[in-house]
């Protein structure tokens, strides 16, 4: 009982309205002298805030001008396409709507399921084909499926799509690292990539929101 009481006295008393502010103060303190690329700081810190993983200060790779290019695209009403419903759910729709934009996820669409079955591929890959067929500029936020990144790479090489930005942050072990490196090899395509195995739909949504919150 004494030990439990001691633990309770060690808990910081923070008002709900101050929780996020205090979290970012802790993140800044723990980053110490780590130098972040100008313009990327908020994105990196939000990824750390979302995951409690400071590796994102090292493994997030930004192509030159990616942040500015992405924000300009959002201002023009460019839609975001995700590879999971979770990623879609995590993006701030109200903020996105301020710029006349919206977010799509085609993973549950019947035509996507049918195309995946007919072509012997994944729904994630088929959903990228559907996004390409929109005939619009698109920002892609991929947090789960490396097959989505592979298909995007193929579509870009075939000249069928020119993404405004690819957020490449799938998590896992099979083809995850390789698919991210494919995106990094596309020197003409703006990208934000979490190198290595880490990432997730929550990180994909987090990066989208970090872009929105600094506009």
Language-model-derived ranges and their functions:
Residues 102-110, 161-177, 189-196:
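Short, acidic/small-residue loops that bind anionic groups at enzyme active sites
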Residues 80-82, 105, 140-142, 192-194:
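General beta-strand structural signal in soluble alpha/beta enzymes
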Residues 87-90, 146-152, 173-177, 200-204:
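Short glycine/serine/threonine-rich phosphate/pyrophosphate-binding segments
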Residues 174-215:
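C-terminal functional extensions of proteins
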Residues 83, 166-168, 207:
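Buried hydrophobic positions in well-ordered alpha/beta secondary-structure cores of metabolic enzymes
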Residues 96-134:
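Long, charge-dense
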Residues 58-73:
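A short, well-structured juxtamembrane/interface segment
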Residues 2-38:
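Charged, compositionally biased N-terminal leader segments and the immediate start
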